[in-house]
Amino acid sequence: MESKSSSLPLFFQKPSGTQLLGLLSVLLVGLAVLISHQPQLNPSNILPLWVPVLVSAIVAGIFGMWIVPLLRRLKTGQIIREEGPQAHLKKAGTPTMGGLIFLPVGLAAGVIFAGFDPEAIAVALVTLAYGVIGWVDDWQVLRLKSNKGISPRMKLILQIAIAVVFCIWLALTAPELTTITFFAGLSLPLGVFFWALAGFAMVAESNATNLTDGVDGLAGGTGAIAFLGVGALALPAHPGLSLLCACLSGACLGFIYHNRNPAKVFMGDTGSLALGGGLAAAGILSGNIWGLLIISGIFCIEAVSVIAQVTYYKATKDETGQGKRLLKMAPIHHHLELSGWPETQIVGAFYLINLGLVLLSFILT
């Protein structure tokens, strides 16, 4: 294995953060251009998606040049968990709350590009609401100088409350969404059970993206690819929502300029909770909950790896209270780290896998 690995080009063994930024830029712009050249997806009367992607990326990158020093002056240094990978301890003190870079830019640009479309505004408000939960959590962590913010119970209650309000609004304005459409014309009418599934998807997605935010550039990059994928699935029926997703995708790309390895800023819960909440809301509103599941494959695996680790540990506890672990550490990106994968190799692999999932969603929806 070692000889095979050493024969790979250096980029595939240990790419730099700047190389990964370049890779992500090519993937996003290339995908946006590809979508824009599909008349059935992006009719001529709809702005090509690559335009909002590029505009938001540039604006977010510039905005971050002001926000990062501000966060540093406000002493928003990240508290690193001692039980995490030891290599991460050197990251202590890196400013957090980096979601303040891409959320204002992505949401404002998205609503403007969408012409203040009601669907875009609704998803923007959901994204902002989840971001506020994350901001409060980040602020509590910094105020108490510990790694514990608001209680998990309170965080969950707030996440559920936002999901319930959004689902009630959807039930009143778009009751036809209760039928899930799969590939080959297959469909599944769920009736009122759809809203329970939709609410669960929003809360689960928000927490899954939060778990994914553990390596420089990982959550922001995979979130950027996922948002563009969901935006493409929303076309041509939901052009305003699609433009919002494209702007959030581009804003995440601009954020990665500052978050690439070695990161100058972390997104914190401010950004990671908002990513998942916004993705889920966009997928549900556009009637693409099946496509959302496929595109969110990386986030699902991250969440399942944590659930499996905890469940297996509890199930194998002996009389001393010690259990066995399925992984060296969860989520799975930490397992790969402790297995010898460089951070940047993990991030690059996840970017490519996520792109593959987006393309798969196009085929299967």
UniProtKB/Swiss-Prot annotation:
Enzyme class: transferase
GO molecular function: metal ion binding; phospho-N-acetylmuramoyl-pentapeptide-transferase activity; UDP-N-acetylmuramoyl-L-alanyl-D-glutamyl-meso-2,6-diaminopimelyl-D-alanyl-D-alanine:undecaprenyl-phosphate transferase activity
Database matches in InterPro entries: Glycosyl_transferase_4, PNAcMuramoyl-5peptid_Trfase, PNAcMuramoyl-5peptid_Trfase_CS
Requisite cofactors: Mg(2+)
UniProtKB keywords: Cell cycle, Cell division, Cell inner membrane, Cell membrane, Cell shape, Cell wall biogenesis/degradation, Magnesium, Membrane, Metal-binding, Peptidoglycan synthesis, Transferase, Transmembrane, Transmembrane helix
Catalysis: reaction(s): UDP-N-acetyl-alpha-D-muramoyl-L-alanyl-gamma-D-glutamyl-meso-2,6-diaminopimeloyl-D-alanyl-D-alanine + di-trans,octa-cis-undecaprenyl phosphate = di-trans,octa-cis-undecaprenyl diphospho-N-acetyl-alpha-D-muramoyl-L-alanyl-D-glutamyl-meso-2,6-diaminopimeloyl-D-alanyl-D-alanine + UMP
PROSITE patterns: MRAY_1, MRAY_2
GO biological process: cell division; cell wall organization; peptidoglycan biosynthetic process; regulation of cell shape
Places the protein is found: Cell inner membrane
One term under GO cellular component: plasma membrane
Domain of life: Bacteria
Bilayer topology annotation: Multi-pass membrane protein
Pathway(s) where this gene product acts: Cell wall biogenesis; peptidoglycan biosynthesis
Record has Cell cycle as a keyword: yes
Record-listed E.C. numbers: 2.7.8.13
Spans traversing the lipid bilayer: 15-35, 51-71, 96-116, 121-141, 156-176, 180-200, 217-237, 238-258, 279-299, 344-364
Record-linked NCBIfam families: mraY
PANTHER family, sorted: PHOSPHO-N-ACETYLMURAMOYL-PENTAPEPTIDE-TRANSFERASE, PHOSPHO-N-ACETYLMURAMOYL-PENTAPEPTIDE-TRANSFERASE HOMOLOG
Biological role stated in the UniProt entry: Catalyzes the initial step of the lipid cycle reactions in the biosynthesis of the cell wall peptidoglycan: transfers peptidoglycan precursor phospho-MurNAc-pentapeptide from UDP-MurNAc-pentapeptide onto the lipid carrier undecaprenyl phosphate, yielding undecaprenyl-pyrophosphoryl-MurNAc-pentapeptide, known as lipid I.
Protein name per the record: Phospho-N-acetylmuramoyl-pentapeptide-transferase
Top-level taxonomy: Bacteria, Bacillati, Cyanobacteriota, Cyanophyceae, Oscillatoriophycideae
Designated gene of the protein: mraY
